[in-house]
């Protein structure tokens, strides 16, 4: 794009989940290195459609602007991605922007990801430290374990993997690849391993690992390139092992 060009955005808007959605088009002055967040900020400063109609600023979630917080995930030209790293010069115009479809809409592009956080609580996705604060340094972790764990720790809970997963729908409570990857991460930690059986038991229930259909869309959509399919396979293996041992032991 050259100087003087316009950026055309078509944004899907709605006041809440219960309200009907509508589309509004905006024409913005192009600037070098514009991303979608910059476009949304420009609209907020001057909320006027391309037809000259006064409207309200578009509601959206954003924080870090460097693909770390995970809050700005949305559908951009039909693809689940982070708005802060979506450069206008690399997008086909008009740019169509929609809220993610697998989460309830709060307003406009802002969605409620509470389902993900409830799933993380369900699988105890944390390291228990109560009573260990006075035990000195934590347990040592082998370098090879660190190398496997670090990519898993990069999850930003953006929800992209749930958005592209066909198993996450109105008829299924599938928790999504990010959750199982966190189970794998915390089960690898020496302290977290104390609750490994509880986590695996949690993913063996409704919406758990058995509901994965191996579509593998998740690993392609992950902005942090987390090996989600490896995590799904590993958690599936751990679940089968725990189930068989439980059956044999009785």
Residue ranges and their predicted role:
Residues 16-21:
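Short N-terminal binding/cap micro-motifs at the start of the first secondary-structure element
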Residues 22-35:
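Short, contiguous acidic and Ser/Thr-rich linear segments
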């Amino acid at each position: 794009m050259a100087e003087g060009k316009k950026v055309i955005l078509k944004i899907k808007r709605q006041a809440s989940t219960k309200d009907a959605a509508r589309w509004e088009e905006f024409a913005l002055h192009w600037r070098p290195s514009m991303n979608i967040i910059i476009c949304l900020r420009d609209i907020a400063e001057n909320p006027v459609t391309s037809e000259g109609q006064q409207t309200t600023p578009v509601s959206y979630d954003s924080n870090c602007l460097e693909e770390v917080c995970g809050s700005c995930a949305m559908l951009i030209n039909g693809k689940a991605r982070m708005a802060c790293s979506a450069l206008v010069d690399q997008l086909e115009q008009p740019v169509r922007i929609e809220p993610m479809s697998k989460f309830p809409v709060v307003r406009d592009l802002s969605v409620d990801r509470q389902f993900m956080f409830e799933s993380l609580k369900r699988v105890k996705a944390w390291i228990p430290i109560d009573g260990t604060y006075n035990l000195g340094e934590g347990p040592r972790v082998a370098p090879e374990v660190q190398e496997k764990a670090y990519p898993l720790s990069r999850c930003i809970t953006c929800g992209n993997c749930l958005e592209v997963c066909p198993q996450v729908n109105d008829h299924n409570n599938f928790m999504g690849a990010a959750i199982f990857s966190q189970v794998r991460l915390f089960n690898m930690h020496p302290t977290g391993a104390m609750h490994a059986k509880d986590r695996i038991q949690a993913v063996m229930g409704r919406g758990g690992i058995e509901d994965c259909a191996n579509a593998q869309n998740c690993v392609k959509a992950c902005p942090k390139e987390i090996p989600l399919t490896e995590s799904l396979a590993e958690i599936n293996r751990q679940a089968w092992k725990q189930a068989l041992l439980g059956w044999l032991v009785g």
